[in-house]
Regions:
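Mobile genetic element proteins and their domesticated derivatives, centered on retroelements
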Residues: 4-5, 15, 36, 51, ...
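A short acidic/small-residue loop/turn micro-motif
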Residues: 138-139, 149-154
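Mobile-element integrase/transposase regions
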Residues: 65-135, 157-164, 168-169, 173-175, ...
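RNase H-like two-metal-ion nuclease catalytic core shared by retroviral integrases
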Residues: 91-94, 180-182, 188-192, 202-224, ...
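C-terminal domain-tail junction helix/linker
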Residues: 196-200, 222-300
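Basic, flexible linker segments flanking DNA-binding modules
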Residues: 5, 9-113, 267-271, 276
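Generic alpha-helical secondary structure signal
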Residues: 3, 10-14, 31, 161, ...
Length: 300
């Protein structure tokens, strides 16, 4: 051993110290990867940045010093970097004779909850067909305040989501704007009448550009990419997955625009409050492939 150490200009003590250090780093890597796997069981599509933010308390409690770049390297070594591909089916039918409303939110920047709701509808594959998820989100807190999962594209789905949002919102004298695309569901008599009854100002996109309703579009990108709401063999399984995903989206998933706080905390006025809102930021849909079976415990 002394001859071997001498070849590298090391003392026996230095060699043992280096070996112990490598063993410690390998053990820490295993701990980190185990926590990554646990978090991705809750939100399968968590990327490096959100994982890093969620793991701060965990790293501190285990006395592990790990930066975001090193975490990214560890994920890459173990094949845990997420990849995406585009996938989108048109669900907006704006070619109709129903009354359309002007865009009221082009320059609007909400300063609190209950000022602006954004709404949209998207598909989820069920069996050989599709079911449709309607959501309403508070633009300030990013909290999904209403949702409905429906087997058809009828207005019943969006109306049910609206009723849930109204029940959560309660009675208030504060002015509220509801923004959506110009699809036939949101222009229908049942939906418009309910908004008017609740004294909510109606706002709609003025073109087919999805960037005019970017916040609502982004919700579906997140739900599909990070919670893997792509396809299910039955409506019941899909509905259960949707409910679990929305609950986790509101209570567990950190948002960059909220200072990496959750929508629930922002909606309750706790912690960091939103400072930025980008109504026309471009979004895209995509798929996520994730494999985390064989973890390599390379040193951090």
């Amino acid at each position: 051993m002394e001859q071997l150490c001498g070849l590298f200009g090391l003392t026996r003590q230095a060699w043992y110290a280096a070996t112990r250090r490598q063993e410690k780093l390998g053990f820490q890597a295993a701990i980190v990867l185990t926590e990554v796997k646990r978090l991705r069981k809750q939100i399968a599509g968590l990327g490096t940045t959100k994982l890093y933010e969620l793991m701060q308390d965990f790293l501190a409690s285990h006395q592990i010093k790990l930066g975001r770049d090193k975490l990214h390297k560890l994920l890459k070594i173990n094949g845990l970097i997420l990849t995406k591909k585009r996938s989108k089916i048109k669900t907006t039918d704006s070619d109709h004779d129903l009354e359309k409303y002007p865009n009221q939110v082009k320059e609007l920047k909400p300063t609190g909850i209950g000022q602006l709701w954004v709404s949209d509808l998207n598909y989820i594959r069920v069996g050989i067909g599709f079911a449709y998820l309607s959501v309403i989100m508070d633009a300030y807190s990013r909290k999904i305040v209403g949702w409905s999962f429906h087997k058809t594209l009828e207005a019943k789905g969006p109306v049910a989501a609206l009723e849930m949002a109204l029940q959560m919102h309660g009675q208030t004298n504060q002015s509220l704007i509801h923004h959506s695309d110009r699809g036939v569901k949101y222009c229908s008599g049942a939906y418009v009448d309910r908004l008017r009854q609740a004294k909510i100002t109606i706002s709609m996109t003025e073109s087919g550009d999805p960037n005019e309703n970017a916040l609502a579009e982004r919700v579906f990108r997140t739900l599909k990419e990070e919670f893997h709401l792509w396809g299910f063999p039955s409506f019941g399984l899909a509905e259960t997955a949707v409910e679990q995903a929305i609950r986790a989206y509101n209570s567990l998933r950190p948002h960059a625009s909220l200072g990496y706080k959750t929508p629930d905390l922002a909606h309750q006025g706790k912690g960091y409050q939103p400072l930025k809102w980008y109504p026309y930021k471009k979004v895209r849909f995509g798929n996520v492939h994730y494999q985390a079976d064989n973890l390599s415990c390379s040193p951090l």
